[in-house]
Amino acid sequence: MSDEETEQVEEQYEEEEEAQEEEVQEEAPEPEEVQEEEKPRPKLTAPKIPEGEKVDFDDIQKKRQNKDLMELQALIDSHFEARKKEEEELIALKERIEKRRAERAEQQRIRAEKERERQNRLAEEKARREEEDAKRRAEDDLKKKKALSSMGANYSSYLAKADQKRGKKQTAREMKKKILAERRKPLNIDHLSDDKLRDKAKELWDTLYQLETDKFEFGEKLKRQKYDITTLRSRIDQAQKHSKKAGATAKGKVGGRWK
């Protein structure tokens, strides 16, 4: 017998049982009424079984049990599958967290290393600049010492040569320069300390700078004066040319006729 036929027989059997139960409930006496005589019990009839076929109720029961077991097993499998999936997701989440933590630690390490390198580089550059500044100051001090040492000798020799050329034709300014050169003491800076020598060099440097500034201003003033003189001479020449032309025109025309 096939599964469909077995199910049909089973459903027919259940329907007949339900019909018999309903008949028994309808025929049952009400509790308030007392029946003196018992009514005959209804006769239960077995479900009709198709002729030529035999129904195996054990097989039906076994199939029901197998079906229930399969459904239960499916529920169990789905439960364990969902639990396994949750565990896998939890493991993956933990791995991502650990990976992110490791990446963050690596980034912090790289950032700290770069910061150390930057600080070391800044310190090296600062030390190099300080060394270069000290070297440059030492060179400047040495140049100033040489310039100051040679300044007096050069200035004195210059005045001596000028005196020899001019001889007795010295002006008041030349006499003043000569007197100042004679009164000027030689520059003795060997006994000075570094600080005093630096101050002395600064003082002389400021004086020299002021002299150069005055020289530049006098030169510019002289240029302006030369330019003014040249412009004035040019204007005078132009005026003289125009006056000569006007005089020649007046001489050539007499009585309304040309000579």
Swiss-Prot record:
Residues 1-62, 101-180, 235-259 are annotated as: Disordered. It comes from the Eukaryota. It holds the Pfam family Troponin. Gene3D superfamilies: 1.20.5.350. GO terms for biological process: muscle contraction; regulation of striated muscle contraction; skeletal muscle contraction. GO terms for molecular function: calcium-dependent protein binding; tropomyosin binding; troponin C binding; troponin I binding; troponin T binding. Coiled coil: none annotated. InterPro entries: TNNT, Troponin, Troponin_sf. One of its GO terms (cellular component) is troponin complex. The modification N-acetylserine is found at residue 2. Signal peptide: none annotated. Keywords: Acetylation, Muscle protein, Phosphoprotein. Transmembrane segments: none annotated. The modification Phosphoserine is found at residues 2, 78, 149, 156-157, 193. PANTHER family: TROPONIN T (PTHR11521), TROPONIN T, FAST SKELETAL MUSCLE (PTHR11521:SF4). Troponin T is the tropomyosin-binding subunit of troponin, the thin filament regulatory complex which confers calcium-sensitivity to striated muscle actomyosin ATPase activity. This is Troponin T, fast skeletal muscle. It comes from Rattus norvegicus (Rat).
